């Protein structure tokens, strides 16, 4: 998955951001499920990357609410 930057997120519509957030949360759930079943993630840094992207999306959402 492509790393999202704040500038790219701000250019998205609200619906696009919501859909991206939903997809990222599903990806995070999938990665955590793989690890919990005893498997190892193909890329260990992927969980961290997904969490940071979710945080960026939520930060931009909160900035726009103000």
Curated annotation (Swiss-Prot):
Q: Which Pfam families match?
A: Ribosomal_L29
For this UniProt record, the keywords arranged alphabetically read as follows: Ribonucleoprotein, Ribosomal protein
TM spans (from-to): none
InterPro entries attached to this UniProt entry: Ribosomal_uL29, Ribosomal_uL29_CS, Ribosomal_uL29_sf
The UniProt entry's GO CC annotations, sorted and at most eight, read: ribonucleoprotein complex; ribosome
Tell me the GO molecular function terms: structural constituent of ribosome
Q: Name one GO biological process term.
A: translation
Indicate the family of this protein: Belongs to the universal ribosomal protein uL29 family.
Q: What protein am I looking at?
A: Large ribosomal subunit protein uL29
Q: Give the species this sequence originates from.
A: Thermoplasma volcanium (strain ATCC 51530 / DSM 4299 / JCM 9571 / NBRC 15438 / GSS1)
Q: Which gene encodes it?
A: rpl29
